[in-house]
Amino acid sequence: MTIRSLFALLPALASLGIPALGEEPRRIDLRTKAGVESVKGEWRWHDVTLVPVAGKNPDGSPNKTYNYEPRAMAADYDDSKWEVVAPETLKDRRSTGQICFCWYRTKVTLPPGVEGKRVFFQTVVDDYGEVWVDGKLPYKVGQAGGNVASGFNYPNRVELADPAPGKTYSLAVFGINGPISVTPTNWIFLGPTFLEIVDRDEK
């Protein structure tokens, strides 16, 4: 490819939300139609309901407690009947307010240009978020951030394993309204949400 033809491609790459060679930051904005289309994605949303279930006390005796539905973390979870969300509306408030939870789901297929790179998914959930990638939410004692919540309106930043052009990942973001103990007067929405492609020695 000649230098002239390379420069001719730059406007097309920009229109798709795909970072051009040497461009900083190298991000694909998942709150734009162009960005989502460039990774063959589609956002879907669903509210979460608390449901009563049988449980156990610490001594093993039975009690009544709560779980939630839908449990939509699996990579192959069928969300085909969920509401399809336009990327530009991810910033809009959703769910019921007060004590509430919800899911945002999409799949992303990595574009050319990720060879030898690291790829991160990052989002900010108003107010707390947990991020499942391909049905997994790894965590450990003392962990702050990554797949689990680390603070109020604080970014979740998760590295996508073994990136390669054409590889698809399932992303499921569990949104939590907060602070829970004050009975929040707001709702749930997504702040800046993107894929970031960085060199191997960057974080």
Predicted regions and their residues:
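Aromatic-lined ligand-binding clefts that engage carbohydrates, nucleic acids, or primary amines
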Residues: 82, 108-138, 171-175
